[in-house]
């Protein structure tokens, strides 16, 4: 019973010794746990350096690696072949002012327009293939109708325009002065195809910039999050990180 009263009573607070006033310029007084952590970190680094020295001594300079065929060295130091990783000012502004949702939305819009332009280019190119033989087959009931068949009358156009395979103008349109000044030529097709190709190239470049911006923002978001990570290597001038596996609960 007496021990219970003894434990219930207030006890003296044991505080750790602080840094003396005359030594305050040296910062906080180091405790044993601080020294142990610093010593453990020092020993870990020394072990890594020892392993690296052993690997350097055991390395055979005449040994062949397949990476030697596409790698370069300068004074024995490997050089990384960097791609054009520069980002223009517009992309930097996007990184600073917009979030990844805005980038993904506009990238989806660009992809849809790229697909539409690719289909449009295939359609325009298919219309003007001069080497392709194009035929329009008309079926009749008997031989007599086949002999008396008039293509101009069947297509309701003139004899001059009946040979066209597309954009065939009808007589009522000619009488109403419609489409008479709109000849469908190969130059028009080439201009349309050239315009579509130029726009497609510009949109592909913009999609590539948006993809780089999305990758940069996603990497920054992951680096700011929780979890242990380690920088493993650099590929094409870009760092590659590896995160520690965590148990899902």
Swiss-Prot record:
Q: Is the keyword rRNA processing in the record?
A: yes
Query: InterPro entries in the record, alphabetically?
Result: SSU_processome_Utp11 (IPR007144)
Q: Which UniProt keywords apply?
A: Nucleus, rRNA processing
Q: Where in the cell is it found?
A: Nucleus, Nucleolus
Pfam families listed in its UniProt record: Utp11 (PF03998)
Q: Name one GO cellular component term.
A: small-subunit processome
Instruction: Give yes or no: UniProt keyword Nucleus.
Output: yes
GO BP: maturation of SSU-rRNA
GO MF terms here are: snoRNA binding
Stated family: Belongs to the UTP11 family.
- PANTHER family for the chain: U3 SMALL NUCLEOLAR RNA-ASSOCIATED PROTEIN 11 (PTHR12838), U3 SMALL NUCLEOLAR RNA-ASSOCIATED PROTEIN 11-RELATED (PTHR12838:SF0)
Functional description taken from the UniProt entry: Involved in nucleolar processing of pre-18S ribosomal RNA.
How is this protein organized at the quaternary level? Component of the ribosomal small subunit (SSU) processome.
Q: What protein name applies here? A: Probable U3 small nucleolar RNA-associated protein 11
Organism listed in the record: Schizosaccharomyces pombe (strain 972 / ATCC 24843)
